[in-house]
Amino acid sequence: MLNDLKLSLQYILPKLWLTRLAGWGASKRAGWLTKLVIDLFVKYYKVDMKEAQKPDTAAYRTFNDFFVRPLRDDVRPLNTDPNVLVMPADGVISQLGAIENDKILQAKGHDYSLEALLAGNYQMADLFRNGSFATTYLSPRDYHRVHMPCNGILREMIYVPGDLFSVNHLTAQNVPNLFARNERVICLFDTEFGPMAQILVGATIVGSIETVWSGTVTPPREGIIKRWTWPAGDNEGSIALLKGQEMGRFKLGSTVINLFAPGQVKLVDTLQSLSVTKIGQPLATAVEATAAAEPAPLPEEEIRAEHRASPLVDDKQDQG
């Protein structure tokens, strides 16, 4: 009964207005009140401020400044093996695995369409049919900048308007085509591992999605698909990003989906749904790589804290 009510609210509540209100409040300078809200947030979600370049919460003029806080350079070591693609974000793996022709796993027993995720762009979808994917959820406690898994040349960016459903265990199980319905920004790159898409997905209360090359992509929310393209390789006007480099950020959280072409990369064997991710740790390896790559083990306390903060974890599950 409670789950039915929560699910009904996802359809009834004015999600766009709630998101606008949250974005407005998070951008306001309110002095001691801003610091109080940040302090309560840090305590509730067990945010590790020792990792931040500015660990003192008084240093942040707005909640947004705190939310997109940069980390110290030494806290996310980058795996520099050229055959290894690294995790793009701190968070938790929602799902990962093979793309079965046009089907991507959303939750156990629930698929959604690759072509729908890519806003009906069948030519782009053809690049990734029978390839692989990884979906990473960023919880409120996480660092909310998104980085490159490998070196890449930006070729295309598409803004897709959509719903703003919350992303959690309940919606993943009950909202069909959740990620293909929500607002999102699709970024297509040429890489040495073939084409790669990195998709930033919005949700309720996600105030904005930004990229390093264009700034704020949304808002404004104009209700139309927008598309930008860039030249390849060393051509004038091309945009190259390096492995581990920041490519975008969320002001309030959400989800990153990576798509990889068939026959190019192999996802790390030990990763599974609810695996905790840290930027710079191995996500996948080139198919011809001879040595396996594994993420560094995390303290159990960190894993428990991440699972407690993640709505992807079913309340009935053992979070320890």
From Swiss-Prot:
Membrane-topology descriptor: Peripheral membrane protein
Biological or metabolic pathway of the protein: Phospholipid metabolism; phosphatidylethanolamine biosynthesis; phosphatidylethanolamine from CDP-diacylglycerol: step 2/2
Pfam families linked to this entry: PS_Dcarbxylase
GO biological process terms held by the UniProt record: phosphatidylethanolamine biosynthetic process
Catalytic site positions: 90, 147, 254
EC class of the enzyme, as a word: lyase
Broad class of where this protein is predominantly found: membrane
Catalytic activity: a 1,2-diacyl-sn-glycero-3-phospho-L-serine + H(+) = a 1,2-diacyl-sn-glycero-3-phosphoethanolamine + CO2
One term of GO molecular function: phosphatidylserine decarboxylase activity
GO CC list: plasma membrane
Enzyme Commission number, as recorded: 4.1.1.65
Site (Cleavage (non-hydrolytic)): 253-254
Chain positions covered by the region annotation Disordered: 290-320
Post-translational modification: Is synthesized initially as an inactive proenzyme. Formation of the active enzyme involves a self-maturation process in which the active site pyruvoyl group is generated from an internal serine residue via an autocatalytic post-translational modification. Two non-identical subunits are generated from the proenzyme in this reaction, and the pyruvate is formed at the N-terminus of the alpha chain, which is derived from the carboxyl end of the proenzyme.
Subcellular location: Cell membrane
Biased composition (Basic and acidic residues): 301-320
Co-factor binding details: Binds 1 pyruvoyl group covalently per subunit.
Positions where Pyruvic acid (Ser) occurs in the chain: 254
Cofactor(s) essential for the protein: pyruvate
Entry keywords, A to Z: Cell membrane, Decarboxylase, Lipid biosynthesis, Lipid metabolism, Lyase, Membrane, Phospholipid biosynthesis, Phospholipid metabolism, Pyruvate, Zymogen
NCBIfam families named among the record's database cross-references: PS_decarb
Family label: Belongs to the phosphatidylserine decarboxylase family. PSD-B subfamily. Prokaryotic type I sub-subfamily.
Record text on subunit structure and interactions: Heterodimer of a large membrane-associated beta subunit and a small pyruvoyl-containing alpha subunit.
Function: Catalyzes the formation of phosphatidylethanolamine (PtdEtn) from phosphatidylserine (PtdSer).
Protein name per UniProt: Phosphatidylserine decarboxylase proenzyme
Organism for this UniProt entry: Klebsiella pneumoniae subsp. pneumoniae (strain ATCC 700721 / MGH 78578)
